[in-house]
């Protein structure tokens, strides 16, 4: 019984980590952060800014949360676990950037959305791979 309580605490902690990180990403995307992250990592034909990398990485963190949860035996959802978790990540990647259309001091940038979606895609790849690895399942 004590082991079950401990496992439930770990599972709840992992779920809080998922939703907590989602809130952090949301806040970082609606709070004015200044122009320091808009540094160019430029080639001659294409402007590539540092914040594009940060957008992708912020969504790639969800892959780490998934894997850590799975290592601890967390069942994220009763059914369609991979699909639901990935759906949350993809919908968040789109909606968080679209939200900036309605915030007066922020600007919607389709390249930011592409960077978000790239991070979400990498997350889905990691989730699918880890889901197929038997050592992560108890």
Enumerate the predicted regions with their spans.
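Bulky hydrophobic segments
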Residues: 2-111, 117-138
């Amino acid at each position: 019984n004590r082991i079950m309580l401990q496992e439930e605490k770990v599972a709840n902690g992992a779920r809080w980590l998922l939703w907590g990180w989602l809130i952090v990403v949301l806040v970082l995307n609606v709070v004015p952060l200044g122009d320091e992250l808009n540094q160019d990592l430029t080639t001659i034909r294409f402007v590539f800014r540092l914040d594009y990398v940060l957008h992708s990485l912020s969504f790639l963190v969800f892959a780490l949360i998934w894997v850590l949860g799975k290592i601890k035996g967390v069942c994220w959802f009763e059914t369609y676990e991979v699909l639901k978790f990935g759906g949350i990540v993809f919908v968040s990647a789109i909606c968080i950037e679209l939200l900036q259309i309605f915030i007066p001091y922020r600007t919607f940038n389709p390249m930011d959305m592409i960077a978000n979606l790239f991070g979400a895609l990498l997350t889905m790849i990691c989730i699918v791979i880890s889901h197929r690895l038997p050592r992560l399942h108890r």
